[in-house]
Amino acid sequence: MTWLKQMWSSILVLAVVVIGARAVPITYLESAVAKGAVCLDGSAPAYHFDKGSGSGVNNWIVHMEGGGWCTDIATCVQRKSTMKGSSKLMNKDFGFSGILGGKQSTNPDFYNWNRIKVRYCDGSSFTGDIEAVDPTHKLFFRGARVWRAVIDDLMAKGMSNAQNAILSGCSAGALAAILHCDQFKSTLPKTAKVKCVSDAGYFIHGKDITGGSYIQSYYAKVVATHGSAKSLPASCTSSMKPDLCFFPQYVAKTLQTPLFVINAAFDSWQIKNVLAPTSVDKSKAWKTCKLDLKKCTAAQLQTVQGYRDQVLAALAPVRSATTNGLFLDSCHAHCQGGSAATWSGDKGPTVANTKMAKAVGDWFFERSTFQNVDCSSLNCNPTCPAVSTED
């Protein structure tokens, strides 16, 4: 659970960064409980909704919160006693910034849209759907129902009239945005322009330091525990094992809806948990290095550089379609679009001399295409922000 705590702490750090943003109150979707659409502990789903105005009144951005996964009864029991498993424990207000920001100066293309942050409390990237409730621990695996209930509620609140719409997310929420992307588009009016944006959600089917793939076995447990198979894209599960369809690189092959991927080539979460997970690092040789790449040996840095090659290979399906977008920087970071500082700020990362806010906006409105890969080595981009060892 150490990595999960680290991920939560990074999200809390991000929340601190956006304290100055507009605080948007929480909405509890109590009507969803009767449909069985509930958090791990049985509490109601929740989201934060900042209504659109002016030219953005019929435009919508639905942003899925991140926060890791739980893989079995034990980790899900731990999770349900946190805000990632119970809406009863969530903060009542959330500061909107970055891609959700309400200021034209920092979010010029989307500032006046209807902006929604969907809280994450199921531990399955909104894919779980098991009818039976764990009798001993009172656990509910209903992430897919939460997703459907929230979308239905937003449709009733005006999203059925959407002219433009984006499904986005950070980390596990960004994975959810990819997995539900085509379904999101099919729910909205056929006349609407609908696209998806993944920020740090392109988790690759990568090899770890032993040559195996710890993340594959990890995701297989998530899919099995939550009964996620039937909620994953049929275009993928019809030809591959369901647990492999938790990986974006296989879903992207058949995705019909345009997707923009924001990712760090040296993603801090993936370096820690896909490349060098604690469970396979028996000698703890990577314990210090994976938290602070400046403390890696030359051999370890070569391995980290090799991970970038794996990332590029996994992104092939995204790069093969001109309708898709890609902002792949060479930073050691995770979830970069959630604060104004990194989304559009003067000191935020650039790729091809472009901030991510402009890259995504130009791509969405088709002012220009944007598929750019940063310089190849770690620390080669001077615009990369410093990354805390807790990120």
Curated annotation (Swiss-Prot):
Annotated knockout phenotype: No visible phenotype under normal growth conditions.
A GO molecular-function annotation: hydrolase activity
EC number: 3.1.1.-
Pfam family membership, one: PAE
Localisation per UniProt entry: Secreted, Cell wall
Entry GO CC: extracellular region; plasma membrane; plasmodesma
Superkingdom as given in the UniProt entry: Eukaryota
Positions of the catalytic residues: 171, 267, 334
InterPro entries given in the database record: PAE/NOTUM (IPR004963)
GO term, biological process aspect, one: cell wall organization
Signal sequence region: 1-23
Annotated keywords: Cell wall, Cell wall biogenesis/degradation, Hydrolase, Secreted, Signal
Family classification: Belongs to the pectinacetylesterase family.
Role according to the record: Hydrolyzes acetyl esters in homogalacturonan regions of pectin. In type I primary cell wall, galacturonic acid residues of pectin can be acetylated at the O-2 and O-3 positions. Decreasing the degree of acetylation of pectin gels in vitro alters their physical properties.
Full protein name: Pectin acetylesterase 11
